[in-house]
Amino acid sequence: EYDKLTYGMLYNYGEDFMLSLNHDDFRDKAFVDMVSGSDEKAHLSDIKAALGFMYAHPGSKMFAAGQDAGLEKFMSELNKFYAKNAALYELDNDPDGFMWLENSNPEETVIAMQRADSKGNKLVIAVNFTPVRRENYRLHVDVRGKYKEVFNSDWKKFGGDEKVNGQIIKSDNDGDDMEYIDITLPGLSFVIYNSEPY
């Protein structure tokens, strides 16, 4: 199942496609009825993680109207963030706009990527598809610099448990000429960091 999340990038630049969650996909069900989780909060967290992956992945997006029940504030903020950050869409059809940072961790079910725009602005997106909180998750990054959390699907204002974190994380070197940051990934969530090179 993990490989299905990464498979699309194998043909992303050879075909035009749309990432779609429409009425045909739901078969008259609500999105929340089609995901796992023991309660409504877990259901909504699951959906937010999936939407985070969808919005971070290259390609046009289509989301069926009325499927955002319980997520109106979250979807409004996510759409605004997407529109304001060209790194998430400008180079959808250009390999320079995308880089995998983590696409081989099925054990922890974490996926991470970097998106970039034509001006060199870069965002790091990490998605945790399990309910397990990952503390000090080591994520290798492309840019040596400072990282700041700019979006977190688990923020309290979205019904989650996290406070807005304005802390700056400085990348470090692992000795093999690879930069990394240690981040916290709440369960069933996605986080976005912007980067500022040293």
Regions found by a protein language model. Give the residues of each.
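Short amphipathic alpha-helical coiled-coil/interface segments
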Residues: M75-L78
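C-terminal beta-strand-rich structural cap/linker in extracellular carbohydrate-active enzymes
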Residues: V164-Y198
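Conserved alpha/beta catalytic core and glycan-binding cleft of carbohydrate-active enzymes
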Residues: E1-A69, K80-A87, D92-N93, G97-N152, ...
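Residues immediately flanking
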Residues: N128-F129, S153, G187, S195
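Trp/Gly-enriched beta-strand surface patches
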Residues: G145-G175
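Aromatic- and glycine-enriched glycan-recognition loops and surfaces
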Residues: E40-S45, E72, N173-Y180
